Amino acid sequence: MRRHMVCAVMGAIMATAGWSQSLTWLDTQFNPFTVPLGVSADGSVVVGMTESFPQQSRAFRWTRALGTQYLGTLGGNASAAYGVSANGSVVVGWAHDVNGQRRAFRWTAATGMVDLGALGGNQSEARGVSAEGSVVVGWAHDVNGQRRAFRWTAATGMIDLGTLGGAESEAWAVSADGSVVVGIAQDATGEWRGFRWTAQTGMIALGTRTFSRDAHLDVSADGSVVVGTHTPWRETAFRWTEATGMTDLPLPSGASVSFAYGVSGDGNIVVGGVDLMARAFRWRSSGEMDDLNSTYANLIGGGAMLWLATDVSPDGRYIVGVGMRGVYEAYLLDTGFPRRGDVDRNGCVDDADLLRVLFAFGERGYRDEDLNWDGIVDDADLLAVLFQFGSGC
């Protein structure tokens, strides 16, 4: 089968595209404070919240084609979007109902906002969604009004993930296939700790570092890398793996605090900020770090600044965050790397990339060869290489 496919693809007409970088300031209709919290795999969809008055935030979904779309509420006056599926079609977050209670929602163009319920209480929030949009995680009140981390699917509804021996927990992110959930939970002493949950292990503490309530965590595609911000003495960005434990990310000279908000699919790129929204930063597992304001100064221009990076696409190419350009504005940064179709990320779309897709053809799972991040290596991924063949070489 692969031999026939090779013959077919080698006979195809190749198209070459250039390598480009860009910075887009999102038009959210002049709201003075906009926070993007999620970006799709190809950078074409951004979700988050805008706020013009206290308690009047609105969940939004922005696309390159249509601009900003407000997703509404569940009958109340406020909402916020926290996560988006890989293809941008599923959005999750919270919205006020008619009683002013926060309720976790899952949105699609076909269904609109759907209330996901709670765990016996009145309120809930969705914080993360799996790559294909079928698994949602967050927190919900139980019958005692305590926050409990949940994992939701259409088949199971909300499942309480428990705690680390204390009263409350919150889930923040989920792996691409929905099997690994990360967040924070109280231990028996009432301290908040980071956790990693699977159906096999249950909730496992990430170590002894403490966290503030509502501390943000993110997880790599396969669930093996967790990033976030721990306390107590000062906010410090970290990267966790089972092999290394929790490792603090380096600080640039003169900085005192750091925040990590997003991680790439392979776990090698972490984005966030340093010094209380002063500079958007990017860290790499190799130890390199850079201030996005310096690296992309030619795109930003005078008088503007990238304050914070809040999410990064699975391949690490697209970064969203909050900047200042007279008012707080959301931005979408296209770093230009990796090129579309560049499976091995060496800057050149060539035979090596083509062969990797061919030999992985039909395989399921979120991997480098799955270029469109839909969970299977198929024709779409093959075409992505073909249409960019020769780029950068």
Residue ranges and their predicted role:
Residues M1-H4:
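Positively charged n-region of N-terminal signal peptides that target proteins for export
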Residues C7-A17:
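Bacterial N-terminal signal peptides
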Residues G18-P338:
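Conserved "turn/edge" positions that cap or connect secondary-structure elements
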